[in-house]
Amino acid sequence: MRTYLDLLQHVLDHGVDRDDRTGTGTRSVFGYQMRFDLEEGFPVLTTKKLHLRSIIHELLWFLKGDTNIAYLKENGVTIWDEWADENGDLGPVYGYQWRSWPAPDGRHIDQIANLLKMLHTNPQSRSLIVSAWNPALVDEMALPPCHCLFQFYVANGRLSCQLYQRSADIFLGVPFNIASYALLTMMIAQVTGLKPGEFIHTLGDAHIYSNHFEQARLQLTRTPKKLPVMHINPDVKDLFAFRFEDFRLDGYEADPTIKAPIAV
């Protein structure tokens, strides 16, 4: 995906070197946007191989409303291990906010279920929004939500999604986020009778960690390949009924993985 490589190059060339929470140091820009037309192929990096299994299982885990890493561990996914406590708990992170946002009156709001209902009953609404940023609970989360708010838009029978990501780890995190929200858009489009439109990715603090510079420059020497095609089981009409086996990525050819340390 040339769009992603352009982001890497832009931050390396124009970013500002700054300190950060982890003590690693970053080079960052503030405010950047990428657009991906989902009819042109599934937006997964081809200039380094991604672990698709982790991306799919993490998304299914979010949609379950789960906040314990047991499900992830059972399925060979380790991307949340560094932040979990001794019991595997992460606090009220993404899944909890998506599916069980606590209201002042004691109710719990299922934002995803509400979104699906609105897409069926009022697809022209400008309130097709899900937020993971709950100021009252941020301090109880193992990690404040990086991809914190997303909005859907329906036009000409196509469903588009825009994600606002306050903190974007460009080398390790952003490729996962692109694929995850593109897949979520495709899944929701299927269960609401729409076609996938665009995924728009808006970044706040878009940064490359200083110990990822060498890896980023290596990736920039590689040439993007044709995007693969994601096939989703057409028989699934309930968003919460999807399983890992319902997804198949065809034609995914990618350069070797580039290893880089995680900043915790």
From Swiss-Prot:
* Catalytic residues identified in the record: 146
Query: Where does it reside?
Result: Cytoplasm
Pathway the protein takes part in: Pyrimidine metabolism; dTTP biosynthesis
UniProt gene name: thyA
CDD domains in the record: TS_Pyrimidine_HMase
Q: Which residues are involved in binding (6R)-5,10-methylene-5,6,7,8-tetrahydrofolate?
A: 51, 169, 263
One of the entry's Gene Ontology molecular-function terms is:
thymidylate synthase activity
The name on file for this protein is Thymidylate synthase
| Organism superkingdom | Bacteria
Classification via InterPro entries = Thymidate_synth/dCMP_Mease, Thymidate_synth/dCMP_Mease_dom, Thymidate_synth/dCMP_Mease_sf, Thymidylate_synthase, Thymidylate_synthase_AS
Task: List, alphabetically, the Gene3D superfamilies matched.
Answer: Thymidylate synthase/dCMP hydroxymethylase domain (3.30.572.10)
**Which E.C. number(s) belong to this protein?**
2.1.1.45
Record function comment: Catalyzes the reductive methylation of 2'-deoxyuridine-5'-monophosphate (dUMP) to 2'-deoxythymidine-5'-monophosphate (dTMP) while utilizing 5,10-methylenetetrahydrofolate (mTHF) as the methyl donor and reductant in the reaction, yielding dihydrofolate (DHF) as a by-product. This enzymatic reaction provides an intracellular de novo source of dTMP, an essential precursor for DNA biosynthesis.
Family, per entry: Belongs to the thymidylate synthase family. Bacterial-type ThyA subfamily.
Enumerate the Gene Ontology biological process terms.
dTMP biosynthetic process; dTTP biosynthetic process; methylation
Task: Name any GO cellular component annotation.
Answer: cytosol
Is Transferase among this UniProt entry's keywords?
yes
What keywords sit in the KW lines?
A: Cytoplasm, Methyltransferase, Nucleotide biosynthesis, Transferase
Residues reported in the UniProt entry to bind dUMP: 21, 166-169, 177, 207-209
Tell me what reaction this enzyme catalyses. Answer: dUMP + (6R)-5,10-methylene-5,6,7,8-tetrahydrofolate = 7,8-dihydrofolate + dTMP
One of the Pfam families matching this protein, by short name: Thymidylat_synt
Primary location class: cytoplasm
Q: What is said about its interaction partners and assembly?
A: Homodimer.
